[in-house]
C-alpha cells in the first residue's frame, strides 16, 4: 500500500499542481455522463475527486464499480475548481483531485443509515452500529475536541509539576453513595472486588506517601440510575495536592479550564471565576449548580404575602415553609391558561403541590389568586418583584427544599422555553461553603453531602457528633452552564477528626475500622494537609461541543438502561464460568 501524502480535509489552494495519494471512504458517488465524481472522506474532512477518461480510462472504469463506504486509495493531482464549481460548504471546496489511479481496498454493505450529519436515525440504531455513527463528521469532530481537551489538561498539569500516577481498578467496596459494580474473586470465593467510583481514598494515600501533586485521567464506575448527563462508566480529571489552600486549588483549576476553552473553542475566559455560596445559590436559583447565563431569579415574598388571605400561602408560612416567586418579564402573553396548567403539572414532579400565578395588566394583578390581594398588598407585591405590565408572576409555597427544587427546575425550563439563554456563552461559577451533611428523609439520618473524607470547617469540628446540621465543609463545586463539572474539597488528615466524622455518619468504631482501617492507620503516619478536585471530562466535552447527552462524547457508551446495543452487554455467562467463581444465579419467578 502506498503511503498517504495528505488527509482529504487538508487539501487547499496551496496544494494546486501537486500529486497526492489519499486513503478514505466513499461518501458519495455521482455519474455525470462520462465523468464520475466521488466525495472522498477521512477523519480530516471531504474532498471531491474527479474521474475523467482523458486522464485515466482505467481509473474511470474502477470508479464506476465503487459504492458508498467502500475503502479506496486514490492517486491524482490537485486542481483548482472553476469559479462556478466552488463549494463554500466544504473546507476543500476550492480544489478537487483529478484521479489517475484508484484501488479498492475493501467493499461495504449498504449501511443501515446514511453516513452524514443531520441524519434522522434512532439512538438505538446509532449505538448498535456505533462504528458507522462515529464516521459522521460531527461525531468525528467531537472526538477531536475530546483529544484536544485531554491533551491540554495533561500539558497544563505536567507544567505545574503534577505526577501522573495510576490507581487500581480492582479495589475494595466502600460506601461512597452510589452502588458499586462488583467483581467476584475466583481465588477467594464469596469475596468481591469493586470497580472504583473514584480514586478518592487512594489519591489521599498518595499524599501520605509524599508525592505532593498527583493527577490521573481515570475511568470511574457507578451503578446508578441513568439520565442524559450520566453514564455507568465515565472519565475524571482527578487531582490531589498537599500543603495548598482551597483558593490555590481553585486557581489551578481555573488556569486549566481557561487553557482548555482557549484550545478547544478559541474563546478567552476571564479569571477569576465568579463565586457564590451554596446558600446563595439555593436562595436565588433553587439549585446548587445554577445556570447564570440568564435571570429569572427566585425571590422570597413570604413577608409580603404572610397576611394575604390565601390559605396555600398562609399554611406554608405557618408550617415553617416559605413563598417564593419568579417574575418572567414580558412573558404574560406567552402562556395561556392551558400552558400554565401544564407548568403546574411540571412542578408537581419536584414535589410542589401546585403553581400559583398572576399576570400584570394595566398596573393590576390578574389571575386566579388576584382576589386575595387588596390594593396595598398588590402594590407591595409588584414593588417587591419589580413587576410591570406584561409580566408573569409564578409562585411556589411549601417547605424550603420543595420550593427550591420546583422553582429551580421551572426556572431552567422557562430559560429554554423563552429563549433567554445565549448558547454561545460559557458561564463558569464556583459554589462554595457547602454544608458537610444533608438530611436523607428515607434513611432518617444525616449523610455526607460530598463524601466522608471532606474536611469540616475548623470552627465546626466540635459539633460533628452533637449538631450535624450546623457543620459546614471546606468544599467547592465548579459549575458550567448549569452543569456541575467538578467537585473538590480539603480532606480530613487527622485520625481523630476522621473517627468523629464516621461516628457522625452512624458508623460504630468497629464498622469504621472494618471498612476504612487501612486509611485510619495511614493517618497515624504523618499525613499532610491536602485537598483536590475531580473534573468530569465527558461532561466538559459535552458542553464545549454543544451536545446535551454524554453518549455523544463517549466512543462506546451505554443506553439509558445501561445496555450496550453494539456488544449486547450485559450478557449471560456460561455455567462453567459461574462454577469457577463459586456463583449461582437466582432465576426470576414467573407468574
Swiss-Prot record:
Pfam families: GAD (PF02938), tRNA-synt_2 (PF00152), tRNA_anti-codon (PF01336). Signal peptide: none annotated. Keywords: Aminoacyl-tRNA synthetase, ATP-binding, Cytoplasm, Ligase, Nucleotide-binding, Protein biosynthesis. Catalyzes the attachment of L-aspartate to tRNA(Asp) in a two-step reaction: L-aspartate is first activated by ATP to form Asp-AMP and then transferred to the acceptor end of tRNA(Asp). PANTHER family: ASPARTATE--TRNA LIGASE, MITOCHONDRIAL (PTHR22594:SF5), ASPARTYL/LYSYL-TRNA SYNTHETASE (PTHR22594). Belongs to the class-II aminoacyl-tRNA synthetase family. Type 1 subfamily. This is Aspartate--tRNA ligase. It comes from Listeria innocua serovar 6a (strain ATCC BAA-680 / CLIP 11262).
Amino acid at each position: 500500500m502506498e503511503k498517504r501524502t495528505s488527509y482529504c480535509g487538508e487539501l487547499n489552494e496551496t496544494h494546486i499542481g501537486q500529486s497526492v495519494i489519499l486513503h478514505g471512504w466513499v461518501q458519495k458517488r455521482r455519474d455525470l455522463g462520462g465523468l464520475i465524481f466521488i466525495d472522498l472522506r477521512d477523519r480530516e474532512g471531504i474532498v471531491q475527486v474527479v474521474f475523467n477518461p482523458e486522464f485515466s480510462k482505467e481509473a474511470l472504469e474502477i470508479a464506476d464499480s465503487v459504492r458508498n463506504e467502500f475503502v479506496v486509495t486514490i492517486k491524482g493531482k490537485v486542481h483548482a475548481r472553476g469559479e462556478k464549481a466552488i463549494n463554500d460548504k466544504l473546507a476543500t471546496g476550492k480544489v478537487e483531485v483529478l484521479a489517475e489511479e484508484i484501488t479498492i481496498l475493501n467493499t461495504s454493505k449498504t449501511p443501515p443509515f446514511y453516513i452524514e450529519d443531520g441524519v434522522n436515525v434512532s439512538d438505538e440504531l446509532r449505538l448498535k452500529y456505533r462504528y458507522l455513527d462515529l464516521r459522521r463528521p460531527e461525531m468525528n469532530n467531537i472526538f477531536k475536541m475530546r483529544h484536544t481537551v485531554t491533551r491540554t489538561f495533561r500539558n497544563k498539569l505536567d507544567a505545574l509539576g503534577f505526577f501522573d500516577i495510576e490507581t487500581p481498578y480492582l479495589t475494595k467496596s466502600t460506601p461512597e453513595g452510589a452502588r458499586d459494580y462488583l467483581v467476584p474473586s475466583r481465588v477467594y470465593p464469596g469475596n468481591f472486588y469493586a470497580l472504583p467510583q473514584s480514586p478518592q481514598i487512594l489519591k489521599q494515600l498518595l499524599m501520605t506517601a509524599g508525592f505532593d501533586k498527583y493527577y490521573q485521567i481515570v475511568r470511574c464506575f457507578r451503578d446508578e440510575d441513568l439520565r442524559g448527563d450520566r453514564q455507568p462508566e465515565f472519565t475524571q480529571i482527578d487531582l490531589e495536592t498537599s500543603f495548598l489552600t482551597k483558593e490555590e486549588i481553585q486557581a489551578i483549576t481555573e488556569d486549566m479550564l481557561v487553557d482548555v476553552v482557549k484550545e478547544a473553542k478559541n474563546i478567552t475566559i476571564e479569571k477569576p471565576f465568579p463565586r457564590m455560596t451554596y446558600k446563595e445559590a439555593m436562595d436565588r436559583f433553587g439549585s446548587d449548580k445554577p445556570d447564570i447565563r440568564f435571570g429569572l431569579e427566585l425571590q422570597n415574598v413570604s413577608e409580603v404575602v404572610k397576611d394575604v388571605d390565601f390559605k396555600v400561602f398562609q399554611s406554608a408560612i405557618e408550617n415553617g415553609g416559605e413563598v417564593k416567586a419568579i417574575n418572567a418579564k414580558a412573558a404574560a402573553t406567552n402562556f395561556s391558561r392551558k400552558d400554565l396548567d401544564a407548568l403546574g403539572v411540571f412542578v408537581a414532579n419536584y414535589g410542589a403541590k401546585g403553581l400559583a400565578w398572576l399576570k400584570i395588566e394595566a398596573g393590576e394583578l390578574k389571575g386566579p389568586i388576584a382576589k386575595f390581594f387588596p390594593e396595598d398588598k398588590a402594590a407591595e407585591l409588584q414593588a417587591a418583584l419589580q413587576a410591570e405590565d406584561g409580566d408573569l408572576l409564578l409562585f411556589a409555597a411549601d417547605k424550603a427544599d420543595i420550593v427550591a427544587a420546583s422553582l429551580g427546575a421551572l426556572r431552567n425550563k422557562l430559560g429554554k422555553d423563552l429563549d433567554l439563554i445565549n448558547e454561545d456563552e460559557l458561564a463558569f461559577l464556583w459554589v462554595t461553603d457547602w454544608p458537610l451533611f444533608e438530611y436523607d428523609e428515607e434513611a432518617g439520618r444525616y449523610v455526607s453531602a460530598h463524601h466522608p473524607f471532606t474536611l469540616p470547617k475548623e470552627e465546626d469540628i466540635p459539633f460533628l457528633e452533637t449538631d450535624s446540621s450546623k457543620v459546614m465543609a471546606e468544599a467547592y463545586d465548579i459549575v458550567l452552564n448549569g452543569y456541575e463539572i467538578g467537585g473538590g474539597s480539603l480532606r480530613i488528615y487527622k485520625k481523630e477528626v476522621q473517627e468523629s466524622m464516621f461516628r457522625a455518619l452512624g458508623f460504630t468504631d468497629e464498622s469504621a475500622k472494618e471498612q476504612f482501617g487501612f486509611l485510619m492507620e495511614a493517618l497515624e503516619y504523618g499525613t499532610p494537609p491536602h485537598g483536590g478536585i475531580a473534573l468530569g471530562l465527558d461532561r466538559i466535552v459535552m458542553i464545549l461541543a454543544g451536545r446535551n447527552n454524554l453518549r455523544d462524547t463517549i466512543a462506546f457508551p451505554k443506553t439509558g438502561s445501561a445496555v450496550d446495543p453494539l456488544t449486547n452487554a450485559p450478557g449471560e455467562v456460561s455455567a462453567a464460568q459461574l462454577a469457577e467463581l463459586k456463583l449461582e444465579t437466582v432465576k426470576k419467578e414467573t407468574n
